């Protein structure tokens, strides 16, 4: 009996037990979180157990070390070295294989000229034409069943000018090499194409060029490997539909990692990045975008190097892609369900998939059935007189306490915006923790103050029912969003799970009431908001509620003080006969026990049937009221808390560093943090008012620590730096001054850093900082001249870019006024791979340019061409982007045709000055090499000393990346 008493005491609904269960729940969630983030590091293949996988990993790691030895953007000579190394490795791997073929775009001189929407800004109305000379390396492995639709595996081998490209996208490239090596040994059933593509960083151009190759007709599916972060685990960033998500589920059995929340966030443009997957998807391919995604403040910086990644990260991407490609290559695929997918993994052990459309249907069923069942059970309990009526104050205290918590949270968020808006960049845990603890602490204080003055017998049950109503409203709203987005809001699934579990808990409570014992008469309100005698009695019992004397004896009708305190919520007998009797939730006294207490008024009425309850009936009642709360707790708290915590962590982990990219992103992250913390608090709010003083004291202490960290700690550190964008601009039309542009977030970060640079501190150099759009700040100053070329004479920067007009018939008397104007330009640019021409007319609202011709020069004189590529646009062309491979070819030969003003507006007017048909052409050419030297007059000098100075002297709390496709931009302008 003593053991039974101890067991029952441990499971009673009392403060200590509830607090302990909350501690256990959050401890388990924390351990699962750590397990999820660390487990992949322990799963490296061992040579004695998996020799083939171990060899693939070690070889891939060696390849990664070689290709990331230096910066290798498309605009650099190192880019060619990486291309040549990859080609050598591909030829080594394929060897004399009878089913392998290799195609090198550089050798075949493949180029494209096409009209392109800005891939990084879908809202842009800027009309762009791009010319690109490709050096993609393609490998075809002909399958045993070549009639099956083929699979493309793709990764890009270029980096940005400021990063070594270990994660972006070196690990993707070496994973492709490992996949190639594996499939050479294990011939696939379906044809595989490998695309080691170039120049993804500045236009997704390598992927675009793929569709100019005949092999593109063989492939229907794609696995794109990418890195939009700097290490960690490779996530299934997005996938085409439910069928492809299920293929991932069936194939990636070890360490699956994916969440459709990422997919929704990416498509909603909360992340200002893009991958080659966009191009493949737009061209009708279906597949998987597997990518590294964090941390963004190291992405595209010098810390995207092999020092900041690991074999564990490489193996996670390599093994994921290998499992997926091996499955797709060898199995027939069920691809019928093409609706968007909701998917997530459980700590890397299990992967779950459901169609977003199916989820919507289930939501509709939940929304329709749950209120019908709830209302039906309520009416039954009313009819059976087992429903206890409650005052309006009892019904409103939970929603009002929640509303008060949200209001206080909003006030606190205003303090964050005023004092430390970028705090999420350093550590999103502290602001989320502050929001979370503030909401639950506010609720605790308000509910307990209300209970002190106006005690309520059934607070937990009322709160659970009201939580059900709140979540029903939220689910209705999110289901509408899901439907209106054509089922593309795939990150809303956690709310469906939360609603389902909370509904079960609420229905169980209503079911217990409906099946409870019928009373002869209504027992009146249990939440006695008046009756001072009862209130004083209740207050005494509330004080006793925290005591834990397990040895206290019990008679057959009354329990110990802790027993009575444990009966707070579930006031329904589970017996098959006899009436239910009232139980005061927060005061621990039922009507049968009250008659033995001298504090109960002598004239107080009692139910005669209650007085006759048998010992067995009372025992059954105590069992139910002791343990039913545990079922409700286990339904509402652990699983929803874990899913919501994981969802908030997924969002913040991907977005917290985007606060550095503008004020809009800052407000987005703040809003996600606020809403996420409220959702995380909802599962425990129906119970939290009951925790003991130790728990609430720790909650208050955690809030104070979190709030202090959030408001007072500097947002940037060595490990979480502020990412700043650099470019050095030389405008030849305004002189040869080499103006340094440094772009970053507002907040007095940039200017103090720049003022401490030696070239500025010991000179009279002026720094001009101005606010630009979206909360960004641009600082400019005259920096040290770049040394882009090796020379034996004085470096003349004006010789870097020269523009020659070969032909222009604008003022020709032989041209009809209704005839388009034609001009030819020759750009002479030294050791260059990328230039941009922008067209503008001062007299026409839209660009009048309708046709562009690129003359491809091979071995002929600069004025001649072997091949021409022409593109036309009826809507006008604003910009021409040029990308060529040959550094020794120092010219771009361009033809431009534009409409005179007469053709665009039909207004024949005098043009005495002869300027109305003028076309302004702005030329910008880019150089991306900085970690190398030029030899000037026999002396080795750094190419971009202004950037070196920033790298060497800026605090470690800053990191640097390129603002444009080159670090040095030389500009000029002409009028045609």
UniProtKB/Swiss-Prot annotation:
Q: Which residues bind Zn(2+) 1?
A: 156, 168, 226
Q: Quick one: a GO biological-process term for this protein?
A: proteolysis
Q: Protease: present as a keyword of the record? A: yes
Enumerate the UniProt keywords alphabetically: Glycoprotein, Hydrolase, Membrane, Metal-binding, Metalloprotease, Protease, Transmembrane, Transmembrane helix, Vacuole, Zinc
Binding positions (Zn(2+) 2): 168, 201, 300
Region of interest (Disordered), residue spans? 528-610
Q: Site: Transition state stabilizer. Where?
A: 299
* Entry keyword Zinc: yes
A GO molecular-function annotation: metalloexopeptidase activity
Low complexity composition-biased segments? 559-570
Glycosylated residues, per the record, are: 96, 121, 189, 212, 217, 656, 768, 796, 811, 866, 937
**Signal sequence segment:** none
Compositional bias of type Basic and acidic residues: which residue ranges?
582-601
Q: Which Gene3D superfamilies match?
A: Zn peptidases
Names of the cofactor(s): Zn(2+)
Q: GO cellular component terms?
A: vacuolar membrane
Active-site positions on this chain: 200 (proton acceptor)
Cite the ranges annotated as topological domain Cytoplasmic. Answer: 1-15, 381-392, 450-461, 518-627, 690-692
Vacuolar topological domain: 37-359, 413-428, 483-496, 649-668, 714-976
Biased composition of type Polar residues is found at 549-558
Q: What is its EC number?
A: 3.4.-.-
Bilayer topology annotation: Multi-pass membrane protein
Q: Which PANTHER family match?
A: METALLOPEPTIDASE M28 FAMILY MEMBER, VACUOLAR MEMBRANE PROTEASE
**Main function:** May be involved in vacuolar sorting and osmoregulation.
Query: What family does the Swiss-Prot or TrEMBL record give for this protein?
Result: Belongs to the peptidase M28 family.
This chain's protein is named Vacuolar membrane protease
Native organism: Saccharomyces cerevisiae (strain YJM789) (Baker's yeast)
